[in-house]
Design a protein with these regions (language model features):
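A short glycine-rich, Lys/Arg-flanked "PGG" loop and its adjoining helix->strand segment in the class I
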Residues: 379-395
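Repeat-blade elements of multi-bladed beta-propeller folds
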Residues: 4-35, 60-91, 105, 109-130, ...
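S-adenosyl-L-methionine
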Residues: 333-360
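Beta-propeller blade signature
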Residues: 33-43, 93, 99, 486, ...
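Extracellular/periplasmic ectodomains of large secreted or surface enzymes and adhesion receptors
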Residues: 2-3, 50-51, 135-136, 142-307, ...
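Short loop/turn segments that connect beta-strands within beta-propeller blades
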Residues: 39-41, 95-98, 133-136, 167-168, ...
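Surface-exposed loop and turn segments in beta-propeller and other repeat-based domains
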Residues: 1-3, 46-68, 106-113, 176-186, ...
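Conserved SAM-binding motif I beta-strand of class I
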Residues: 320-325
Length: 840
């Protein structure tokens, strides 16, 4: 993990006709900057800084958003056009003379693309596919990497190199008229060549790499001149001055030449003169580490001096240290000392900047120190900059001389919300009550999507935020990340934990509820037979609990899961009630949505505190906890939802029978009240603060047949009195935000049911609304958010797609978006996990 610019310069430069073209920025909503500079003067020829914000069709059909181009890959200039690689999508084309937009077929070719481009005047290739340069229309797909070989085309195909030439061809248009067009036809092929990774043409030679092999082919003689192995996968090939350069994913660069060499040229590792241990700084580092308790994460050394404190902190801890110094002389000195110590660039970096305006990301530092302060040097750092840089929930400022160290530990952000359960809390409000984050949004951090997660149609568990930790469940592990800087803190291996969710059924947690929650200092995660208690801070296992036996005395299986104030709540799942997949198909036996028994355990010991055995069945979505009570609907399970349900010809569909709402004492399990008149709902949500219990449906895309929708009712939590009951149209799971119920389709006063103004619109996107006090998040082609606090409009954060249920949450004063796009073939520009903050 490293700090980089919000606008990384990934648009590799191209030079043509005395002009250099380059680009910066990968997130369209942050702005993409494409620039042309004159080589002789360095003056700007043109700048395109608007097409990142372009409102346009997105990769998924029917999806439009304010999300335009990105800059990711080597640019190509050819015949009056600049081709801009956009990462995972097809290239955009600009006019090379003025930078004006020509085309970007993001939706039309929504499952094509990549960063590799080869220009041929009237045509270009992108990741093996031939396109017409005039209009960007696709013509033909080749099987592997493509390179230019003079006027011809070379491509890797089925174990060899296939060379093509241009040819005039004919075809019939849609009206049957014969038309001429320029295409390609095979010229010659050579087999037995490694390939498939990268391919370039150099004069009459073709260079191909495949895995750890590289080969050079003489196109004139159509022979393999030589091939060799390298260490790692050979991703980069380049030729210049009669030499071939090969770079691998293991960090090696090889140079090959046709000239005879006396021997292999290597540069021996430089012997480093390690600075001696300076007692003052060694003692200071020891005191800082012991008093702060911070030994991992990001450390900022504001006013680092000559880097001595940074050297000692690096020696005594696992911190990654960023030094800031205003004095250019000290910057140079610190860099040299750190380089001599073998630490520069790997463990420690030095930047020159104002100590009061570092331009580093907000909330970055787990630890803030000052090397100059160790010896009593003057260091003036504004309090607001110190606060801005320090991570909430435990970030530490430790500045001063040995023995006079001032320690300042940052707590939670005032007004920050939490997201501890699937729908924010055990009350199912779908609202974190975060009062800090609001639009407009901008990037705080991003990282590779390196935790394998269930494919998006599997609707895996929502991410959680608790006490500064982002907890995400993957296919084979649960991971805790520092929510404020994206650093992995721990990972607990659970092979196959979400295997059942890695399918195209579009059910998942929409029916089962989550198997993951947090409470206090614990993470709870159930794996059918047992529930693990894991330490939130360390990832260490603290306990393992089995559910109680069924009424029949058989071993129980975990279904629903929640934790509140040290108590663990769960259900014994009904393994006979198996719902039908909502999309293509799925193995559903491990995706259970109904239970026969509700119970409570001690959250530390696992001791059974009480149980409620249902008269009929308890739907997992129809459980809400808060205000010292457990609310649930005891109702016959809906037969029409199941795989085995078959309706006889002419038979009326079996309705979902009504049931009863019960309020149970959360401590004892005793029934406080029960209402059994006209109980129609399939979900419950609770506002404990307002003493309101909402009953409704989850009438979303790919719903179960029993989710008929069209109605809501509200009960008073003290006695079950029905406050109001209305027929209303909505198309998402309801969200409770203070005094208002929000859903796609409308908003209603929580206490009266009266309509409230809510002009909500979004583009294509399944999934539900996840809100804070000031905004709500959802999929709207890309990531969408609705500004509740100010404009009452929908906006996009572009360049990525959300999952198909809940994976973007407003909590901790920020927006957290771990990747949930696995399995999607649509060429959204970026696939990453990230956090957003309110733009200043």
């Amino acid at each position: 993990d490293n700090i980089c610019s919000m606008w990384p310069a990934r648009g590799g430069p191209a030079v043509a006709d005395g002009v250099i073209y380059w680009a910066a920025g990968i997130w369209p909503s942050e702005g993409i900057f494409i620039e042309a500079l004159r080589l002789d003067t360095g003056k700007r020829a043109w700048l395109n800084d608007t097409d990142g914000f372009r409102y346009m069709p997105q990769p998924h059909g029917g999806a439009d958003a304010a999300s335009g181009v990105s800059a990711q890959g080597h640019m190509v200039v050819d015949k009056g056009r600049v081709y801009l690689p956009t990462g995972r999508a097809v290239p955009a084309a600009l006019n090379s003379a003025d930078g004006k937009y020509q085309y970007f077929h993001l939706q039309k070719y929504g499952q094509l693309g990549g960063s590799s481009i080869a220009g041929f005047g009237t045509h270009f290739f992108n990741s093996g596919r031939l396109f017409n340069a005039q209009n960007g229309e696709s013509q033909v797909q080749l099987s592997g990497p493509v390179a230019r070989l003079g006027k011809n085309i070379a491509s890797f195909s089925k174990g060899g190199i296939q060379v093509y030439r241009w040819a005039q061809k004919t075809k019939k248009d849609r009206k049957g008229k014969v038309i001429k067009f320029t295409g390609i036809e095979p010229l010659w092929k050579i087999d037995g060549v490694p390939g498939g990774t990268e391919l370039i043409g150099s004069g009459s030679a073709i260079v191909s790499s495949g895995g750890d092999e590289v080969a050079l082919i003489d196109s004139a003689g159509k022979t393999v001149e030589w091939k060799t192995k390298v260490k790692g996968t050979a991703h980069g090939l380049a030729s210049a001055g009669g030499r071939l350069y090969v770079s691998t994913d293991e960090g090696f660069i090889y140079c090959f030449s046709g000239k005879d060499n006396a021997g292999q040229a290597t540069e021996p590792a430089r012997k480093r003169a390690l600075p001696g241990h300076l007692e003052t700084y060694a003692d200071a580092a020891d005191e800082i580490l012991k008093n702060s308790g911070v030994r991992e994460g990001y450390c900022l050394d504001l006013g680092c001096g000559d880097g001595s404190l940074a050297i000692e902190l690096a020696r005594q801890s696992s911190l990654k240290i960023y030094c800031i110094e205003e004095d250019p002389g000290l910057v140079e000195k610190a860099r040299k000392r750190l380089d001599d110590a073998g630490l520069y660039g790997t463990r420690v970096v030095v930047h020159q900047a104002s100590l009061n305006k570092t331009n580093y990301p907000k909330y970055l530092a787990n630890l803030v120190v000052s090397g100059r302060s160790v010896t009593g040097g003057t260091v003036k750092i504004a309090d607001d900059e110190l606060t801005r840089l320090t991570r909430p929930w435990g970030g530490v400022v430790a500045i001063g001389k040995k023995g006079k160290l001032e320690i300042r530990r940052r707590g939670a952000l005032a007004g920050a919300g939490s997201w501890t359960h699937q729908y924010s809390n055990p009350a199912n409000t779908c609202c974190s009550e975060d009062a800090i984050v609001k639009g407009p949004l901008r990037m705080l951090w991003f990282r590779d999507a390196d935790l394998p997660v269930p494919q998006r149609h599997g609707r895996g568990p929502a991410p959680l935020f608790h006490k500064g930790y982002l907890v995400v469940e993957g296919l084979n592990a649960v991971r805790a990340t520092d929510a404020y800087n994206g650093r992995t803190i721990w990972e607990y291996s659970l092979p196959g934990i979400l295997k059942a969710y890695n399918q195209d059924h579009l059910m998942g947690t929409a029916g089962t509820g989550s198997n993951l929650c947090t409470d206090g200092d614990s993470v709870y995660i159930h794996q059918k037979e047992t529930c693990l208690r894991i330490d939130l801070a360390t990832g260490k296992k603290l306990g393992e609990f089995r559910p109680p036996s069924t009424v029949a005395g058989k071993p129980g299986r975990w279904g629903y899961l929640a934790a509140v104030d040290g108590r663990l709540y769960g259900t014994i799942a009904d393994s006979e009630h198996i719902v039908k997949w909502r999309y293509l198909k799925g193995e559903m036996k491990d995706l259970l949505t109904e239970s026969k028994t509700f119970f409570s355990l001690d959250g530390k010991s696992g001791k059974l505190l009480w149980r409620y055995d249902a008269e009929h069945s308890i739907r997992h979505n129809a459980i809400a906890i808060g205000g010292g009570k457990v609310y649930l609907i005891d109702r016959k399970a809906a037969a029409i939802d199941t795989i085995k349900y078959r309706r006889a010809k002419g038979e009326k569909e079996i309705p979902h029978p009504g049931g009863a709402i019960l309020a149970l004492d959360a401590t004892t399990g005793k029934v406080d009240w029960k209402k059994d008149k006209d109980i129609f709902g399939t979900m419950l949500a609770l506002s404990a603060e307002k003493n309101i219990l909402l009953m409704g449906y989850q009438p979303t895309r790919f719903r179960l047949p029993s989710e008929v929708g069209g109605r809501m009712a509200v009960f008073h939590t003290t006695d079950g009195y029905r406050v109001w009951d209305r027929k209303v149209d909505y198309a998402s799971r309801p969200m409770l935000n203070d005094k208002t119920i929000y859903a796609e389709g409308g908003a209603w006063d929580l206490k009266t049911g009266v309509d409230r103004e809510f002009k909500f619109k979004r583009s294509y996107g399944c999934g539900i609304l996840a809100g804070g006090n000031n905004l709500m998040l959802f999929r709207s082609a890309t990531m969408g958010y609705f500004d509740l606090a100010d404009t009452k409009k929908t906006y996009n954060y572009g360049g990525l797609r959300l999952g198909c249920w809940v994976n973007a949450i407003p909590a901790g004063g920020i927006v957290l978006v771990p990747d949930a796009s696995a399995g999607c073939k649509c060429s959204y520009l970026n696939q990453a996990s990230l956090a957003l903050e309110t733009a200043d």
